[in-house]
Amino acid sequence: MIAFTDIVGMDLAKQALMLLAVDPSLGGVVIPSTVGSGKSTLARAFADILPEGTPFVELPLNVTEDRLIGGVDLEATLASGQRVVQHGVLSKAHKGVLYVDSLSLLDSSAVSHIMDAMSRGAVIVEREGLSEVHPADFMLVGTYDPSDGEVRMGLLDRIGIIVPFTPVNDYRARKQIVSLVMGTRNEEDTQDELRMLRGIIGAAREQLHHVSITNEQIKGLIQTAISLGVEGNRVDIFAIRAAIANAALNQRTEVDDEDLKLAMKLVLVPRATRMPEREPNPEEMAQDEPPPQEEQPQDEAEDQNAPPDEADSDADEEQEETPDMIEELMMDAVETELPDNILNISLASKKKAKSGSRGEALNNKRGRFVRSQPGEIKSGKVALIPTLISAAPWQASRKAEQAKKGIKSTAALIIGKDDIKIKRFRDKSGTLFIFMVDASGSMALNRMRQAKGAVASLLQNAYVHRDQVSLISFRGKQAQVLLPPSQSVDRAKRELDVLPTGGGTPLASALLTGWETAKQARAKGITQIMFVMITDGRGNIPLGAAYDPNATKASKEELEKEVEALALSIQADGIASIVVDTQMNYLSRGEAPKLAQKLGGRYFYLPNAKAEQIVEAALS
């Protein structure tokens, strides 16, 4: 295994891990990067620089709830005749490190338990008559590939440092990596370097409580967080602690500008939702000033000083009339009144579910243990207490029967096949909302601002319920997946904010892309899926246009047949739908309502719609 000091490059990530070693109250370090970048090797090597005896526990992705938080050790309990408690992975990481590779793929139930443990510093085990509290105060180190999906925001909120980095591409560095792996390392030199580094970190831990930071520096970090659009006071505290930890690592008693810059780089910038605009310097302003002009007649001067929108309106109209020109229109989302429960209403129309339990389903493998039922050992996890209770009344008769047969049994209990009880769990199977936003030229003429606002409000509703979202835009010749299924609502909003518009309306491509995304999600265990289509419903680009330049033209009947065939297939597949119509009344020919009918979904008219009107329409 490669040691921490032998790893080439990745300086920022190594520095982040060293800060965590100095101040465990930073919560943890998350390292997102592509496959083969060395992130997992670095994370595992983190154990080298921790104090001797510090637990370093790796969490498998397929961990069960019993192994994660602990419970009754069935084998030991049956052998001893007394209940034996088994500690889970989280409590084994107490005062140490919990490492998770492919963090974004970790089961949502496991993520919830980790979040709870990080908040409490302990794990509460309550199951099968057992109620215990196990200490679980640990640092979390996670690595993942962003292409696999995003890490749950609630978990990232509890982790101080996020360090994205790219694979080493410098020739000399890559040659050094190859030589290191293929050659012979001097183990003695490596151990000397590790001892030295552990000594530096130990000294920094002692120095940590002697480092001071001024009110002005704290104010600067907070103002930076605000300007970057970073929300939450917890992040401010993480940034302050990171700056202090770096000062301690460098054996300083006061935080300086370098410490503040590093804290911003590791804590604030990765969480930024916007980037502040740089103010032009005096030289740039001087260069931008127009040269002095000769005096002109007043009327002519007034014409030249007219607002750009008015002065260039004729030119703009001429450009809009050019058919070969695709105009990019960037618009900001604005508030739109849509009911908070619009998603719940439409889900209820497909599948009746109790409030607060959206997407929950019973299974034999994972989730919260709710009850037991008769079954075979191979079909699930044995419910120990119910099994023992079922077997207890028959012990005397079973032992007597064995005695008649001349069988001597030393077993404390004789458990029959009919006594076995299997655990039943309730787990959130997950709800995926696939937002399909029409970004064609016709949308730009209608209500793109309101459409973006509508999606933003629906995204917020999905965030509250911890659902997954996917964002698909369709314009030009085909649809494009801007965001694969993810719990990162913030990322979806960022993609939405910069969504360009223009070109044709490949409605059939949008339906096909959404359907393929839904199929992939189902293969990963997501059972409830909903389409949210923001469109005027006026498709004019056939499916083949993305592959065949000659297929851009099709008759209205052919286009309608494509859309109808896909819509009916999607409805037959049990996917719920909402169609939000953005068309103006005087232009509408009823395309969006027809689309909603073919999908078997709910229809809402966006312009001028009020929340109560949409709710009434959904319930009617």
Curated annotation (Swiss-Prot):
Disulfide bonds: none
InterPro entries attached to this UniProt entry: AAA+_ATPase, BchD/ChlD_VWA, ChlI/MoxR_AAA_lid, Mg_chelatase_ATPase-dsu, Mg_chelatse_chII-like_cat_dom, P-loop_NTPase, VWF_A, vWFA_dom_sf
Pathway(s) this gene product operates in, as recorded in its UniProt entry: Porphyrin-containing compound metabolism; bacteriochlorophyll biosynthesis
Listed EC numbers: 6.6.1.1
UniProt cross-references to Pfam families, sorted A to Z: AAA_lid_2, Mg_chelatase, VWA_2
Reactions catalysed, as given in the entry: protoporphyrin IX + Mg(2+) + ATP + H2O = Mg-protoporphyrin IX + ADP + phosphate + 3 H(+)
SMART domains assigned to the protein according to its UniProt record, in alphabetical order: AAA, VWA
Stretches assigned to the VWFA domain: 432-620
Keyword terms, alphabetized: ATP-binding, Bacteriochlorophyll biosynthesis, Chlorophyll biosynthesis, Ligase, Nucleotide-binding, Photosynthesis
Acidic residues compositional bias, start-end: 296-322
GO MF, any single term: magnesium chelatase activity
An annotated GO BP: bacteriochlorophyll biosynthetic process
Residues the record lists as binding ATP: S33, T34, V35, G36, S37, G38, K39, S40
Top-level taxon in the UniProt lineage: Bacteria
Chain residue ranges for the region called Disordered: 272-322
NCBIfam families noted in UniProt: BchD-ChlD
Function according to Swiss-Prot or TrEMBL: Involved in bacteriochlorophyll biosynthesis; introduces a magnesium ion into protoporphyrin IX to yield Mg-protoporphyrin IX.
Family the UniProt entry places it in: Belongs to the Mg-chelatase subunits D/I family.
PANTHER family per record: MAGNESIUM-CHELATASE SUBUNIT CHLD, CHLOROPLASTIC
Protein name per its UniProtKB record: Magnesium-chelatase 67 kDa subunit
